[in-house]
């Protein structure tokens, strides 16, 4: 199994070790712990969990990195989500694309001028400030100018020229998590996910805890040590389990 996961971040490609089976067990325990906690407590716990793994990176990059490493570790770019159709009340299962290509700086056209924005390195309560503080440069007549070299009046004029539709696209692109779930039954539904807490709760099911230990038990009975199992990545453990089950047929 490959033991490196590549993530494309604003400053280039970074390499990370995949999560192990031991890590995944911890995620299950955390998921179970937050089940009946308040939204604020859930946010704090998941934020701290991710920071423990990727604390050397900006806070805004960490959710993206966590999800990329998680996806690489389980060996799947899609998960499955179950929902209840609001109309017929039937239970439906749909695929959920959880892979994001990269985290990068942004370029948008505003009033015939290209504006380049750095991907934020911190979270902002004030969204307008998040945009103005991260504008890096502007392109006029094929020439790029540093934002700081432009007069304050010109800066204000350019920012004011940003249309609502473009503004919404910029804010959307500044989310480290940006996933879309498509659901279909009697009608079609679309749900956007921009919060790592919501995504974590979808991907890590507390009901998996019993199955998790059951799989470990099966592998131990096939002469794998708990230590070696814990050091596997989840995708690898899944392959081993399939081989064991195939041998029993």
Curated annotation (Swiss-Prot):
Record's note on what induces expression: Expressed in the late phase of the viral replicative cycle.
GO BP: any one term: viral tail assembly
KW Chaperone (keyword) present: yes
InterPro entries: Baseplate_phage_T4-like
One Pfam entry name: T4_baseplate
Origin superkingdom: Viruses
Keywords, ordered alphabetically: Chaperone, Late protein, Viral release from host cell, Viral tail assembly
Function of the molecule: Chaperone that is involved in the formation of the central hub of the baseplate.
Entry protein name: Baseplate hub assembly protein gp51
Species this chain originates from: Enterobacteria phage T4 (Bacteriophage T4)
Gene name, Swiss-Prot/TrEMBL: 51
């Amino acid at each position: 199994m490959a033991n490196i996961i590549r993530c494309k971040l604003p400053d280039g490609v970074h390499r990370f070790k995949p999560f192990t089976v031991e890590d995944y067990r911890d995620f299950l325990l955390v998921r179970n712990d937050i089940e009946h906690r308040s939204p604020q407590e859930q946010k704090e716990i998941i934020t701290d969990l991710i920071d423990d793994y990727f604390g050397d990176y900006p806070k805004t990059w960490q959710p993206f990195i966590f999800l990329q490493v998680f996806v690489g570790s389980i060996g799947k770019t899609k998960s499955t989500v179950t929902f209840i159709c609001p109309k017929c009340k039937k239970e439906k299962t749909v695929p959920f694309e959880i892979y994001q290509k990269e985290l990068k700086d942004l370029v948008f056209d505003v009033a015939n001028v290209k504006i380049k924005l750095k991907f934020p390195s911190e979270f902002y309560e004030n969204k307008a400030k998040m945009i103005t503080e991260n504008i890096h440069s502007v392109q006029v007549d094929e020439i790029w100018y540093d934002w700081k070299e432009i007069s304050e009046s010109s800066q204000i004029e350019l920012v004011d020229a940003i249309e609502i539709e473009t503004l919404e696209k910029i804010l959307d692109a500044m989310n480290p998590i940006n996933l879309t779930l498509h659901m279909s039954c009697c009608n079609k539904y679309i749900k956007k996910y921009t919060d790592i807490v919501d995504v974590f709760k979808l991907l890590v099911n507390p009901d998996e805890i019993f199955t998790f230990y059951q799989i470990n038990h099966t592998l131990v009975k096939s002469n794998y040590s708990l230590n070696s199992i814990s050091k596997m990545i989840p995708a690898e453990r899944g392959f081993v389990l399939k081989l064991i089950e195939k041998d029993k047929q």
